[in-house]
A protein has these predicted regions:
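A surface-exposed partner-binding patch
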Residues: 1-112, 182, 187-188, 194-220
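Long, low-complexity, intrinsically disordered segments enriched in glycines and aromatic residues
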Residues: 56-177
Length: 220
């Protein structure tokens, strides 16, 4: 089965290069996972399969904010290991409907797809999960590649922010301070309106923030 193009990833790599941000990328394995192949009991999102056909792992913009995509190659399957570990842990019930594929460097923040809400082509929406104390999620993209695209625009705004040199990512935290960027994602907005993520947004601030995304969309 063929893999799909990833224009969002291409833009993210271009932005990192243009802004002089760190990029650490490992080559793909000889036998990358196919779209919809079972990984930790979950069909692999086709955009993630496309990513792993190009790279075995990526750490992008760690000197600004940081996006890590877990390692999968001929020697390591971090997707399998991380998802199995999280589902077996004390927060396992929360992670059961999610498929974690990355996170932020050195923080208990994960990026995960929500397989139950995949679109007709099988592409899964993405949430950011905060696991400090009681876990909660923020819906951030309709697909994995849309996350890459949105994150690339976020990095441009972050680096241009007047407080970036002094405060780093705290000057414009992702995704809390950029609901206007997520509001451009029409399918994400539709899923939020339909209540698809309500069970995952266990935090009152998360629910209020999702309302900010909807308000930002109404102003487009």
């Amino acid at each position: 089965m063929g893999t799909s193009a990833l224009p969002g990833l291409d833009r993210l790599l271009e932005v990192c290069g243009r802004l002089g941000l760190q990029q650490s990328v490992l080559p793909p394995g000889k036998h990358p996972p196919e779209p919809f192949a079972p990984v930790a009991g979950t069909p692999l999102d086709p955009a993630l399969a496309s990513f792993y056909s190009r790279m075995g792992k990526a750490i992008l913009a760690a000197d600004a904010d940081g996006l890590v995509i877990f390692q999968v190659d001929d020697g390591i399957n971090q997707l399998e290991a991380e998802n199995n570990a999280l589902r077996a842990g004390w927060q396992g019930d929360y992670f059961a409907p999610l498929f974690v594929f990355g996170g932020r460097p050195l923080l208990a923040h994960y990026f995960a797809t929500v397989p139950n809400w995949s679109d007709p082509s099988g592409f899964q929406p993405v949430v950011r999960v905060d696991t400090y104390e009681r876990p909660y999620a923020l819906p951030i993209a309709s697909t994995v590649d849309r996350l890459f695209d949105t994150y690339s625009h976020y990095l441009e705004e972050l680096v241009a922010h007047e407080d970036f040199n002094a405060d780093g990512a705290a000057a414009l935290s992702f995704p809390w301070k950029v609901p206007h960027l997520l509001a451009r994602d029409e399918r994400l907005v539709q899923l939020i309106r339909e209540g698809s993520f309500d069970a995952l947004m266990t935090d009152a601030d998360a629910r209020a923030w999702s309302g900010e995304v909807l308000n930002a969309h109404s102003r487009l």
